[in-house]
Design a protein with these regions (language model features):
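Short S/T/G/P-rich N-terminal loop/turn motif that feeds into the first structured element of a domain
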Residues: 1-33, 37-39, 46, 61-67, ...
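Short active-site oxyanion
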Residues: 50-53
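Short hydrophobic/aromatic beta-strand micro-patches
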Residues: 55-57
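Conserved short beta-strand edge segments in small beta-sheet-based binding/regulatory domains
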Residues: 73-85
Length: 90
């Protein structure tokens, strides 16, 4: 299944709000998007606020974006994830 890296610019939110958004994303996925897999997310602090980088697998970029919209989350940039580099395997 194709994998995607989603950049979400969340703005000036708290870590608690980020966690609430994650719970909402999980609930929407479980209820309406069983064909989407949320692998993990990284949360970073920028000068403009919180940003997340989320790795998802799904049948299409459109389906992943539909999940984000249904969860009320931005999907500011969505990239095709080509591969992972694992230093333990180099």
């Amino acid at each position: 299944m194709p994998r995607y890296l989603i950049q979400r610019n969340l703005g000036k939110v708290t870590l608690q709000e980020v966690e609430e958004a994650g719970r909402r994303s999980k609930q929407v996925r479980e209820a309406s998007f069983p064909d989407i897999i949320w692998e993990h997310s990284h949360v970073v602090q920028t000068k403009d606020g919180m940003r997340t980088y989320c790795v998802y697998a799904g049948p299409s970029v459109e389906r992943v974006k539909a999940h984000a919209a249904a969860a009320g989350l931005p999907a500011d940039e969505v990239f095709d994830l080509v591969t992972d580099v694992d230093p333990a395997k180099l």
